[in-house]
Amino acid sequence: MSLIQSFKLVLSPPHRAATPFLLAGSLVGLLGRATPWRPTRLLGNAGIAFTAFCLYFFRDPKRVPPPRADLVLASADGRVTSVALVTPPAALEMGHTPVWRVSTFLSVLNVHINRMPAAGEVTKIAYHAGKFLNASFDKASEHNERNELRLTLPDGRNIGVVQIAGLIARRILCFVEEGDRVEAGERFGLIRFGSRTDVYLPPGVEPLVVEGQTMVGGETVLAKL
């Protein structure tokens, strides 16, 4: 990535989900800095710093998905922490045959917008309240707060996508509903302050990524259908 591209990424406008945090931080910053009392001014400085952090955390850069319908794309920015054959989540009703699951861990420094891995129809959404274990742990997929989606492709095959809250993340946002038709790379959700996203590939589809690889949501190719 060039220096100019890096600056464009950092300076990307924030997602609308940042609005309440930006307003709160700005208000604390302005009111705190407007008083001569030192403790209040320190609080104001903290408000300004928090606002700057939220501008960075909620950045929403433009992504350009590959113009091909036979690809599965990354659903999140971050680092691949696991590529494993597992049984899909029962709530998604994708059968009991083990499929490849690609887990991507998002640190607080990554872009946290979740994107659709392919074009299709959202045919199932299942939310589960749970714990807030470190999202990089494998057991987080079963015990943490999570939101599971089933995406049905035009050919009838299914892809599972799971948003998993982490140690710091306490709020999963999902912008789609069952019955929605979506495009590859389309924004569908966000997880605040550190998280993980799992993608379950259709049976017989092999992943093209490895553990430790850096992902770019909506652009990196996970697999070929």
Curated annotation (Swiss-Prot):
Binds 1 pyruvoyl group covalently per subunit. It is an enzyme of class 4 (lyase). InterPro entries: PS_Dcarbxylase (IPR003817), PSD-A (IPR033175). The active site is at S195. It is found in: Cell membrane. The record marks G194, S195 as: Cleavage (non-hydrolytic). Its EC number is 4.1.1.65. The modification Pyruvic acid (Ser) is found at S195. GO terms for biological process: phosphatidylethanolamine biosynthetic process. Is synthesized initially as an inactive proenzyme. Formation of the active enzyme involves a self-maturation process in which the active site pyruvoyl group is generated from an internal serine residue via an autocatalytic post-translational modification. Two non-identical subunits are generated from the proenzyme in this reaction, and the pyruvate is formed at the N-terminus of the alpha chain, which is derived from the carboxyl end of the proenzyme. GO terms for cellular component: plasma membrane. It catalyses: a 1,2-diacyl-sn-glycero-3-phospho-L-serine + H(+) = a 1,2-diacyl-sn-glycero-3-phosphoethanolamine + CO2. Its cofactor is pyruvate. Pathway: Phospholipid metabolism; phosphatidylethanolamine biosynthesis; phosphatidylethanolamine from CDP-diacylglycerol: step 2/2. It is a peripheral membrane protein. Catalyzes the formation of phosphatidylethanolamine (PtdEtn) from phosphatidylserine (PtdSer). Belongs to the phosphatidylserine decarboxylase family. PSD-A subfamily. This is Phosphatidylserine decarboxylase proenzyme. The lineage of its organism: Bacteria, Pseudomonadati, Pseudomonadota, Alphaproteobacteria, Acetobacterales.
